[in-house]
Amino acid sequence: MKDFIAIDFETANECPSSVCSIGAVLVRDGEIVKTFYSLIKPEPDYYKWFCQQVHGLVHEDTDCAEVFPYVWERMIAELPDGIHIQSEDTSDDPDAVPFVAHNAGFDSRCLREVFRCYRMDYPEFVFHDTLAASRSHFSGSLENHQLQTVAAACGYDLTNHHHALADAEACAWIARKIL
C-alpha cells in the first residue's frame, strides 16, 4: 500500500471515546510526507491506572489539552491540499486515502465513539488492519503479532511503544512492507 494515513489512539480509561492522544502519519507514494501528534482532553475525563501503566499519560498531561473536535479539525487542516480521508462514500476518489491501524478494530471504534460523544457526523471511514495483515503475511513465523514484534520483523525499531505517534510511525512502516 502506497497511500494512506496510519493512525493510533491512546485512551485514558475503558471508554473508547476517552482518547487522550492521537498520532497520525500520512504516506503518499510510499513515503512519509506528514506526521501529526496531539494530546487530547479525554471524554470522559478520568484516567484508569491500567491505562496510565500502558502509555504513561496522566490527568495533568491532558488537563489543558484541546477536546477532540478541535484536535480533529487541526489534523484535517494540516493535510496537503486535495487530500482527504477515505470513507465508504468516497472509495472511488483517487485523492481519498484510507486509514491504517494495528488492531484497526480498536482504533476505528475509538474514532467512531469519540465522534458520537461529540455529536459529530461519522462518515464510515475505511480502515485497513496491519494486525490482520501480519497474521496472514507471517502466518506462524512470529512469536506473536503485537505491534513491536511485527515492526521488528519488518525492520523497524519501535523504541517508544504506546506513544501514539511512535505507534503510528511503526504501523506506517509495517503497512508499506506488507499491505
Task: Give the ranges of each region predicted by the language model.
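Conserved non-catalytic scaffold segment of RNase H-like nuclease domains
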Residues: 1-117, 124, 140, 144-162
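Short, glycine/acidic-enriched loop or turn micro-motifs at the edges of active sites
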Residues: 11-13, 132, 170
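Short alpha-helix boundary/capping motifs
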Residues: 79-81, 129, 139, 175-179
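Active-site catalytic pocket residues across diverse enzymes, especially alpha/beta-hydrolases
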Residues: 115-119, 178-179
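Short alpha-helix plus adjacent loop in nuclease-associated cores
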Residues: 128-144
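Generic alpha-helical structural context detector
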Residues: 132-135, 152, 173-176
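Acidic, divalent-metal-coordinating active-site segment for phosphoryl/phosphodiester hydrolysis
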Residues: 163-176
